[in-house]
Amino acid sequence: MSKQTFTTTFAGKPLVVEVGQVAKQANGATVVRYGESTVLTAAVMSKKMSTGDFFPLQVNYEEKMYAAGKFPGGWMKREGRPSTDATLTARLIDRPIRPMFAEGFRNEVQVINTVLSYDEDASAPMAAMLGSSLALSISDIPFNGPIAGVQVAYVEGEFIINPDKAQQEASLLELTVAGTKDAINMVESGAKELPEAIMLEALLVGHKAIQELIAFQEEIVAAVGKEKAEVELLQVAADLQAEIIETYNADLQQAVQVEEKKAREAATEAVKERVIAAYEERYAADEEHDRIMRDVTEILEQMEHAEVRRLITEDKVRPDGRRVDEIRPLAAEIDFLPMVHGSGLFTRGQTQALSVLTLAPMGDTQIIDGLEPEYKKRFLHHYNFPQYSVGETGRYGAAGRREIGHGALGERALAQVLPSLEEFPYAIRLVAEVLESNGSSSQASICAGTLALMAGGVPIKAPVAGIAMGLISDGTNYTVLTDIQGLEDHFGDMDFKVAGTRQGITALQMDIKIEGITPQILEEALAQAKKARFEILDLIEATIAEPRPELAPTAPKIDTIKIDVDKIKVVIGKGGETIDKIIAETGVKIDIDEEGNVSIYSSDQDAINRAKEIIASLVREAKVGEVYHAKVVRIEKFGAFVNLFDKTDALVHISEIAWSRTANVSDVLEIGEEVDVKVIKVDDKGRIDASMKALVPRPPKPEKSEAKKEGKHD
């Protein structure tokens, strides 16, 4: 296929899609040019079905530093592992694409997005999402798209699609929404305490823009799309399924209704093991043994899935016996750890998170060096999910995509209420340790984070709480669930996380397993989430009503002083020599910004005071009219040089030593002698003139002698 180009304008910027020129050996490939951003997307599919029990989809978002005209930082001058932003963008693209493949599809699919040119005013992630959908849609890969995504900002009461950098910085909303022509299927958002009504309107505005992009894609698919390949779907034998359901469904139904998680898992596992053992014995010698046993396992999963959903939709009974809008039992505690800067323990049913606060000087902020201009990140929220939290063994090591994503969600939720740098000049790190999990652990980490911040004396604007909403839908009827647990998340159709204050929403995240949900469901879920959020906030405020007025004794104290910008180099010294000496002598940490704000940190107030004194003396300036107790350091014929303080000297001219005539300076002063002087002049070059005689009264002029008077008459 020769190169074909498709052009439109979207959100005020040119949008160009090129097909047929590059990456032609992939199943599908596109080059999307949006503004000055350019993204290459290639989609490929394995020829055979994988043997795993899940759909192996991999979506990558690769940031090439050359795209922004930047040289890679660090000693390795080559792109390495994906940045946090790249990982989050890959997840953002994966989530709306994944539900668009058929049930039982098991061929491995990879979608690789490479940013070739980066324009900070034209969203490369949204270009990559469009490219991913198009590459799959025009390929022979069985994909039930297209989908599209947009960013939505809210500036001065107006919604803006795919805002530029300045609009993003002015916005009260940072929303990414994706979906199909008919419905929304992915949401990711941070917001400055916006009400539910505005959030819902933003979603609808975003979906309307999505429909434009889908219409554009449909034109391209009609022109260059390939015929979809016939692939084998994972399907179980109907007769085997009927037999197992008839024989064992009643036992499995009973096991599923056990309310306590561990007991329920044990009961369902016992039924499954009995079924597997029976069929293992029956088909041990059968040549189709592996396929049959795979089917048995899949059938049991489907039976559990169907029973959990039936109980909720028909009987309105949840696995643990709760009402559909009921939260699990709550508990909150502060000061769980003695030596840290703040800690909070939050428990919701069998989900528990410990959040630990650490405060540090601004010099410890994380430097982010990606495609955007380098910047410093003041607030970090890290989320850890050890396998023991679910009673299992597993991999331990670097944070995976899920942990990075959950940490970022908590970061967005809590960042909206943090004090400004001027109010609270600290770098802030929260670490959420999930100690126990049965669903909604990311939202528990937000609640625990609020407790830790308030216990640590961080003056947040308001407490934040989070809740996860679920959905069970059969296409006609649906049930929205409050505070979903693990089983409801696994077998349900939606995981909709909502975090916020009493004032409004600070973060949203929605993933669904069906092709989309309606505005009515979104509105109902947001209303139900608000009620639950307020209930959790009641508990948080009962535990700690407001942030403590003081920091923990172990937290670094801070003091700030302002110096003239031209004195910064004096405090730092040649090669940092002076500031390093101050730090070594006092044990403090010191940060100096470009405007001359000096921040001094230490857990020892005396050390801070000593450092302040040293810095104050370094930047001290002599002022006209001030009096100093000085030391003579040099004598010349025309006067004496005296040291006022530190490295600041002044000249006492011979005429300023005394009111009477001084013949020789050395007759009156000697080196090392201490004298009081008054500054009488500072010129534009900083040279200082001082006077000794200005500190003593001028003697009266002598009266003329009578003799002289008489002599004049002679």
UniProtKB/Swiss-Prot annotation:
Full protein name: Polyribonucleotide nucleotidyltransferase
Similarity remark: Belongs to the polyribonucleotide nucleotidyltransferase family.
Role, per record: Involved in mRNA degradation. Catalyzes the phosphorolysis of single-stranded polyribonucleotides processively in the 3'- to 5'-direction.
Top EC class, one word: transferase
Lineage start: Bacteria, Bacillati, Bacillota, Bacilli, Lactobacillales
Binding site residues for Mg(2+): 489, 495
Biased segments, Basic and acidic residues type: 700-714
Keyword Flavoprotein found: no
EC numbers, comma separated: 2.7.7.8
GO biological process, alphabetically ordered: mRNA catabolic process; RNA processing
Localization, UniProt: Cytoplasm
Region (Disordered): 691-714
Cofactor(s) annotated in UniProt: Mg(2+)
GO cellular component terms, semicolon-separated: cytosol
HAMAP family associated with the record: PNPase
Catalysed reactions, semicolon-separated: RNA(n+1) + phosphate = RNA(n) + a ribonucleoside 5'-diphosphate
Residue ranges occupied by any S1 motif domain in the UniProt entry: 625-693
Keyword Transferase: yes
InterPro entries referenced in this protein's UniProt entry, alphabetically: ExoRNase_PH_dom1 (IPR001247), ExoRNase_PH_dom2 (IPR015847), ExoRNase_PH_dom2_sf (IPR036345), KH_dom (IPR004087), KH_dom_type_1 (IPR004088), KH_dom_type_1_sf (IPR036612), NA-bd_OB-fold (IPR012340), PNPase (IPR012162)
MF terms (GO), sorted A to Z: 3'-5'-RNA exonuclease activity; magnesium ion binding; polyribonucleotide nucleotidyltransferase activity; RNA binding
Ranges of residues in domain KH: 556-615
Keywords from the named record: Cytoplasm, Magnesium, Metal-binding, Nucleotidyltransferase, RNA-binding, Transferase
Pfam families per the UniProt record, alphabetical: KH_1, PNPase, RNase_PH, RNase_PH_C, S1
Superkingdom in the source lineage: Bacteria
